[in-house]
Amino acid sequence: MFPADPMNIGAILEPLGLAAGQVIPCREWRELYAALDCGAVAAIHPFYTAAVREFEDAGKPIIGSAPVGVEGTNSWIDSVGDTFNIAKKIIGETKQKILPQIQKSLDDKKINNKITVSGYEGSELIVARTLIEAGAQVPYVGTACPKTKWSTEDKDWLESRGVFVKFRASLEDDISAVKSVNPDLAIGTTPVVQKAKELGIPSLYYTNLISARPIMGVAGAGSLAEVILQAISNGSRMEKMKSFFEGVGEGDTAGVWEGEPNLKPQFRAHQAKKIEKRKIAAKAEEMI
């Protein structure tokens, strides 16, 4: 988690009479023991199944999703309130204090663009939720992580808004989405960003530029919009770069050639046959 997010979560919990504890996975066994003394566990990144299993064995209740955007935070506060049997009045007062601030932060920096989201961090779904609440169209969300019951709420929320959510997404899945959707911005891993740039589409590295900022609460709503809008504004520069480098080749024909590129069609054909043979052999083994 981004270092500021536990503080942002703590600010949401404070009016409920609660506090944020240790962040897990942790570095020291002392922190793990302190974490096991908690009243409940927020599975903010719901893919740490081994860590969650330890808390389940210790009899601790697990809360899925995360306090992102207005709807996500509203639902999360309800879940926390139910877990700790907090009075409805206190829950209502907490919402009145927190939710308008998040809404204002989202309204101040509207994102009226189409964005694809992919990565391997585990926070892709909650980032997409925040972007949609900020006004963005997000047709595709891909995560390399598996589907777990702690991400079900986020998945259902996204799918109800027409988002295609892909768990265990491959690089091919992510690149295919970028090509077919032709977004105003592609957020993804290094090869996804490289492919988007080749296509002249503004792009952001998920790990460096999305995970490296707060996502939760009021701070998260504002900080995400800032970097997104700045990247989208580079669209015309990307088009200029694409036209400037047009005709220099790509893949194994990239670069400046004095003559024709040294293509090796016979080598490609030979490799294709070898790959096909391996596929046939693998299929035969499955049948056995």
What kind of feature is each model-predicted range?
Residues M1-I288:
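An N-terminal assembly and electron-transfer interface module characteristic of large anaerobic redox
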